[in-house]
Amino acid sequence: MPRVARPFRRRRCNRARAFLEIANDESYDAVWCARGGYGSCRVADAILRGLAEPARRKAYLGYSDAGMLLAGLYRAGFEAVAHGPMAEDILRDGGEVAVRRALAWLVDAAPETLEPTVGGARNTAAFNITILSQLLGTPLQPDLEGHVVMLEEVSEAMYRIDRSLFHITSNVQIKRVAGIMLGRCNKIPPNEPDFGMSEEEVARYWCRRSGVPWLGRADIGHDIDNKIVPFGGSARPDA
């Protein structure tokens, strides 16, 4: 095995072990992701197999690459899973706003923390575009039939966003969602030559072509204004 692989493998095992230690501990009420980063697809299976009954009574919050884990948890029937700010957001300018929002949801299930369209009878879910595209067709893919699916992106060129949205809207299960909403796509690198369409134009195009309803814009993204989107419903079941 190459030497460079050992530290990564060790970190991977440590991350899974640390997650399970907290998730299965009765004395904790929530698991709040510190950051996204890469590698969650490598630990998700071990984590999901190792979760015990106390883990089902917790709230889980994160976004970006953590969406792999959130998807797996939701597929496994966990009821308090949400896309929203992470601890690392404190490092952004004005990041304390995002952190307060996360804590208000985790501690009090405060309704003002939610993305404004969340609520009512419609189920919801939210993902980073690249993450959702890459988990489709895997054991982590949850059943999103009838859900409003909100999507956001960061640091991906428009041609990649286009390709990912093609893949998402072509999926048989995604064709049964209630519709797609587009959050913010931040820090898009320039295309050379220019792609010629904005992120909203691209999303509208693939919704129209696939027959998936376009439901407008969502207040989520890789930024301090990232609102909370619970998977399935508008409130934490233990609130």
Where are the regions a protein language model picked out?
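Charged helix-capping and loop-helix junction motifs
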Residues: 11-17, 163-168, 194-202
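N-terminal glycine-rich "phosphate-gripper" loop used for MgATP/nucleotide binding
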Residues: 32-41, 63
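Short, acidic/small-residue loops that bind anionic groups at enzyme active sites
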Residues: 48-72, 80-86, 213-215
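Glycine-rich, charge-decorated loop segments at or immediately adjacent to ligand/cofactor-binding or catalytic sites
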Residues: 67-78, 223-230
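Conserved anion/nucleotide-ligand pocket segment
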Residues: 78-137
